């Protein structure tokens, strides 16, 4: 008794735990194992009392998911539970009405209408089973039961109406569920969507059964009742047919139902009940769970596969590309193979678990039969022993009768023993099968673990391939961008030249055409035609003058950047000689010499840019004079090629030639590389290094003075920005001074190690090229320091641009980098002075970055302060400001693209000229 009470307690506790775990607030489908435990419990208990007792303690109105899972679980119990479940559920039918009314107007996350429909469905379903107790919960009726129902015409007529109502309730439920899925944009691969869709699996099974019975019963009614009396049946059935067909088609497209339930296909047209021949061609729609294998499978494990998680079954989609990458195709194939293997393993495990549970149930049943047989055998033994004792006490006269009774008892005992042995053999057989099934399950789990590991390895391989693909795409993008930039710059220059040539040719053709077409009329009206041609030529000359002026404006911009590139002086001298020869042509004095004017203007703008760059390359001291003269020549050229001045064309061209002769003289006087005296280069280096030190000290002092003036003239955010920028500039100059000191110490060490008993002057003379490199670097540092101070002063006073200061800081960092590289060339790699110089160079780079960051932050702060306060604007004014801001943004983007193209062209020209110089020096060295 104690053992039975303990087993009973364990059973009840398991039922309570299963109900509590099945009905939870988590938006995931109902767990099959918990539902299966409850269903098996109803069969073992032959009642659903424990379930309803447990559910009565749960406050289903607390959360919509609780009510939804409760309805799903009740639906499962009605189908797969004990045959008494529908009868017992009818006692709680009012509970469904209460829940339906409660959730009717509470559209919580979309569950409200769905729960209302589900509760109404269960209410009608329980009432249906109570009205027709012959119909089981799973709706499986054999032919004899169906014929019994069809025997009573009135009952069959009313039953078809009730079945139509059941179909309506099921279809209303699926409509509500799909409407909620569409409104929330859920799909069948997420847990929330699966939670909503899981009850529709039972709806598919129920609708297929009701549909089959309706077709057969309505055909039977038409054979016994006039068709006019069944018009309502036919009308309702046609509507239900269309809705059911749509339901099956939509459900078959969902990935969630694909591996769980077999969805039947209905014909294109509803059966014609007025023709009994359609009944012969009618085919019963079979809907069954895949875990059952057919519609006649065991009900206890009918929903094992219902929670198959397909959330990860969606294959990874590679980003669309016009040309598919083989590696991406390999990734997709590997992903699909992994998912297929995983699905096969999971399905195999589900089937194994289902069979194990069948074996366990059968084992429990056999155990009960075995215990019953054992008790009968014990009772038979006791009866035999009792009879033997009675036979010993009876009279001898009844010996034969007693012997017969003893033999009969012995035969019964022997039969009981044989039956017991058979039951024991069957029990051992099922036990061995159970052990074998457990062994197979363990092997399957090991295979699953191996497949999971293989999937993980393949995922890592896929990730690596993705990274390689992305890196290759980035490399291709960078290469394409670079190629497009270079090609764009070249194409733009070529396009401009071609456009200019085309315009000149078109203008020439226009002039020639005018001359030819009016040649015959020239005799009659020569004065008039001459004036027209003169006006046309003047217009052409005016247009060409505008083009030349634009080239001069471009040249003026190029003069501002003359210090950013290097240019060989001898090439500039050659271009200057060509320009002098061309401007000596007296045809330029004529206003209508359009072709010569255009060519001369183009050559003049190019030569002026080259002259300024060559002067900076040859000698920084000579740069100022040459640059000023270039600007003077440019101004004279603008006057000479325009019609605004009162002077004649010949006088303006004469003044231009004089300015160009002056510039040519300055270019001739530029020092060449061969003019540097190797004997005095050492002294020049020392002097330049001292001048560089003085320039840096003066720059530091001027920055301090600028800082003092800024404190006096500004306040607030402007003062904070100026303080930050000037402090970083001062720190930059300090580390540059340290780098210069380290460079001089390293140079002293190099000279001491390499003079070999000679004087430093002799060392500088022997290594004059290295000395010249140091000299050039020192000059660049001095000039860059002065430019930095001027840019900082302009930023503080508001007269300059923040970008100028950024460029100046980067320029001085580049100059110090040149000094660092020049000093490092002949240094010993193990020298401590070289290490100190490297540390100083890194400090310069860091402080340069800090200056750039401070300038950008200050610019952002000031822009935010000045431009982001729009509280004073009206609606119309704000819209106008918005449009103007967009226009300005587009203009700036266009200007940025043009400057990038210009920079690319300048760099290309610079590299080309540098290559020419290198080739010429190589030829001279060979000679």
Curated annotation (Swiss-Prot):
It comes from the Eukaryota. One of its GO terms (molecular function) is clathrin light chain binding. SUPFAM superfamilies: ENTH/VHS domain, I/LWEQ domain. The keyword Transport does not apply. PROSITE patterns: ENTH, I_LWEQ. GO terms for biological process: actin filament organization; clathrin coat assembly; defecation; developmental process; endocytosis; neurotransmitter secretion; protein localization; ultradian rhythm. Keywords: Actin-binding, Coiled coil, Cytoplasm, Cytoskeleton, Endocytosis. CDD domains: ANTH_N_HIP1_like. One of its GO terms (cellular component) is cortical actin cytoskeleton. Transmembrane segments: none annotated. InterPro entries: ANTH_dom, ENTH, ENTH_VHS, I/LWEQ_dom_sf, ILWEQ_dom, Sla2_fam. This is Huntington interacting protein related 1.
């Amino acid at each position: 008794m104690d053992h039975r009470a303990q087993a009973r307690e364990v059973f009840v506790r398991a039922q309570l735990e299963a109900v509590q775990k099945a009905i939870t607030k988590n938006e995931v489908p109902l767990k099959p194992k918990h539902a299966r435990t409850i269903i098996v419990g109803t069969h073992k208990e032959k009642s659903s009392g424990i379930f309803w007792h447990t559910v009565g303690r749960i406050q289903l109105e607390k959360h919509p998911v609780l009510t939804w899972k409760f309805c799903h679980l009740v639906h499962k119990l009605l189908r797969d539970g004990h045959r008494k479940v529908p009868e017992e559920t009818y006692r709680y039918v009012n509970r469904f009405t209460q829940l339906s009314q409660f959730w009717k107007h509470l559209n919580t996350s979309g569950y409200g209408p769905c729960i209302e429909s589900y509760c109404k469905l269960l209410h009608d379903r329980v009432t249906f089973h109570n009205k027709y107790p012959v119909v089981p919960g799973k709706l499986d009726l054999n032919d004899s039961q169906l014929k019994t129902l069809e025997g009573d015409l009135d009952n069959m007529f009313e039953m078809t109406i009730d079945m139509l109502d059941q179909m309506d309730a099921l279809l209303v439920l699926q409509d509500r569920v799909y409407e909620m899925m569409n409104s929330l944009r859920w799909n069948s691969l997420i847990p929330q969507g699966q939670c909503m869709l899981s009850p529709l699996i039972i709806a598919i099974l129920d609708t297929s059964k009701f549909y089959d019975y309706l077709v057969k019963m309505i055909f039977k009614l038409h054979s016994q009742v006039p068709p006019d009396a069944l018009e309502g049946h036919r009308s309702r059935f046609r509507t239900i047919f269309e809705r059911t067909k749509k339901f099956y088609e939509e459900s078959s497209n969902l990935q969630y139902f694909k591996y769980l339930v077999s969805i039947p296909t209905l014909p294109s047209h509803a059966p014609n009940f007025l023709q009994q021949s359609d009944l012969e061609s009618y085919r019963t729609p079979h809907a069954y769970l895949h875990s059952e294998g057919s519609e006649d499978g065991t009900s206890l494990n009918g929903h094992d596969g219902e929670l198959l998680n397909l959330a990860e079954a969606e294959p990874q989609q590679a980003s669309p590309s016009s040309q598919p990458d083989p590696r991406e195709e390999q990734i997709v194939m590997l992903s699909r193979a992994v998912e297929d293997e995983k699905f096969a393993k999971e399905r195999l495990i589900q089937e194994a678990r289902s069979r194990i549970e069948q074996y366990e149930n059968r084992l429990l049943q056999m155990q009960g039969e075995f215990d019953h047989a054992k008790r009968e055998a014990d009772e038979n033994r006791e009866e035999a022993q009792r009879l033997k004792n009675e036979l010993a006490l009876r009279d001898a006269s009844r010996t034969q009768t007693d012997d017969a009774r003893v033999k009969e008892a012995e035969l019964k005992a022997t039969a009981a023993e044989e039956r017991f042995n058979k039951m024991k053999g069957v029990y051992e057989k099922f036990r061995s099968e159970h052990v074998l099934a457990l062994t197979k399950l363990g092997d399957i789990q090991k295979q699953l673990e191996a497949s999971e590991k293989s999937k993980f390895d393949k995922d890592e391989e896929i990730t690596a391939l993705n990274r390689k693909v992305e890196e290759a795409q980035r490399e291709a993008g960078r290469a394409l961008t670079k190629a497009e930039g270079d090609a764009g710059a070249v194409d733009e220059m070529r396009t401009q030249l071609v456009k200019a040539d085309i315009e000149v040719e078109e203008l020439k053709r226009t002039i020639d055409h005018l001359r030819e077409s009016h040649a015959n009329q020239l005799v009659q009206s020569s004065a008039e035609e001459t004036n027209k041609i003169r006006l046309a030529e003047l217009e052409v000359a005016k247009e060409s003058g505008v083009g030349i002026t634009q080239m001069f404006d471009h040249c003026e911009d190029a003069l501002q950047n003359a210090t950013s590139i290097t240019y060989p002086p001898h090439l500039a001298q050659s271009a200057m000689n060509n320009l002098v020869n061309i401007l000596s042509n007296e045809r330029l004095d004529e206003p209508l010499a359009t072709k010569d004017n255009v060519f001369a203007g183009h050559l003049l703008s190019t030569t002026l840019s080259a002259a300024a760059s060559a002067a900076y390359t040859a000698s920084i001291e000579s740069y100022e004079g040459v640059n000023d003269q270039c600007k003077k020549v440019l101004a004279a050229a603008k006057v000479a090629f325009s019609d605004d001045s009162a002077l004649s064309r010949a006088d303006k061209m004469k003044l231009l030639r004089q300015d160009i002769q002056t510039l040519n003289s300055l270019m001739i006087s530029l020092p060449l590389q061969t003019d540097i005296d190797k004997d005095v280069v050492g002294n020049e280096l020392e002097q330049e290094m001292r001048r560089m030190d003085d320039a840096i000290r003066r720059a530091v002092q001027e920055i301090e003075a600028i800082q003092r003036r800024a404190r006096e003239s500004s306040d607030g955010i402007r003062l904070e920005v100026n303080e930050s920028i000037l402090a970083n500039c001062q720190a930059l100059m300090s580390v540059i001074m340290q780098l210069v000191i380290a460079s001089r110490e390293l140079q002293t060490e190099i000279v001491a190690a390499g003079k070999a008993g000679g004087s430093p002057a002799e060392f500088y003379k022997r290594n004059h090229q290295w000395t010249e490199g140091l000299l050039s670097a020192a000059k660049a540092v001095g000039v860059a320091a002065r430019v930095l101070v001027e840019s900082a002063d302009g930023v503080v006073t508001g007269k300059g641009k923040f970008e100028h200061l950024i460029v100046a800081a980067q320029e001085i960092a580049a100059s110090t980098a040149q000094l660092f590289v020049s000093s490092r060339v002949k240094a010993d790699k193990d020298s401590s002075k070289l290490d100190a110089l490297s540390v100083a160079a890194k400090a310069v780079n860091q402080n340069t970055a800090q200056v750039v960051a401070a300038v950008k932050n200050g610019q952002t702060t000031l822009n935010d302060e000045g431009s982001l306060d729009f509280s004073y604007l009206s609606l119309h004014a704000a819209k106008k400001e918005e449009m103007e801001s967009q226009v300005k943004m587009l203009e700036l983007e266009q200007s940025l693209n043009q400057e990038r193209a210009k920079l690319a062209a300048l760099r290309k020209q610079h590299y080309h000229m540098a290559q020419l110089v290198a080739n010429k020096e190589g030829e001279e060295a060979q000679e």
